[in-house]
Amino acid sequence: KQRNMSERDFDWLSRMWSKKLYKSQKEHYFGKLFSASANMPSFQSYFPEGKVLYMVRDPLQVIPSGLSLVTGVLDKKFGFWNQPDDLRKRYLLRLYNALKELLIRFHEDWINENIKKSKVKIVTFNRLMGNFDNLMFEILEFLEIEKSEEIEKLILETAEKQKAFKSNHKYDLEKFGLTEEQIKNDCQNIYSTFLSGDF
């Protein structure tokens, strides 16, 4: 049986964000959440005025990155890669399925109109890297934040640096018991809906 702890989690987030806003005397708070995407309808119901920037990146980059991050922490603490082979394989499969589930749940809610799309902006990683300035101006408009000269200058400077950025991360899918074909097949709906050029 799956436990739904979203109400408890949203209560906690609400308290934390309220404290941060009070202390900073700011009007808005920007949170970076990894798990809200798996339960976006409930999140929007609890925070009806909230706006969401949902980052979409190629699952061939996202999933190995998540696997590498989690197993790296586990290896430092528990020597993950020295554990018995069957234990590692079982854990990696479960972790892969969980990371995949985060993507698929949001996609299912999106295509089934369970998400208030007017409150969500889809941001693709490719646009973030290749068209940073225009994307940022769109985001400011979406968030109803006034574009000051200072913000515009900062965005244009960052856009120039962004063009030269190259990620040094290389992931060995075989290490995680995966293949490129498997990820593409499992996440084919993510590609067709969000990564086909419409966003």
Q: Where are the regions that the model predicts?
A:
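PAPS-dependent sulfotransferases, especially Golgi type II membrane carbohydrate sulfotransferases
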Residues: K1-F10, L21, H28-Y29, L67-I122, ...
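Non-catalytic, well-ordered alpha-helical scaffold segments
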Residues: D11, P41, R57-L60, D133, ...
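Conserved phosphate-donor/acceptor-positioning beta-strand/loop module used by diverse small-molecule
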Residues: S42-S68
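Short His-Asn-centered micro-motif
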Residues: F30-F34, V56, F125
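Flexible, glycine/threonine-enriched loop-and-boundary segments that flank and lead into catalytic domains
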Residues: K20-E49
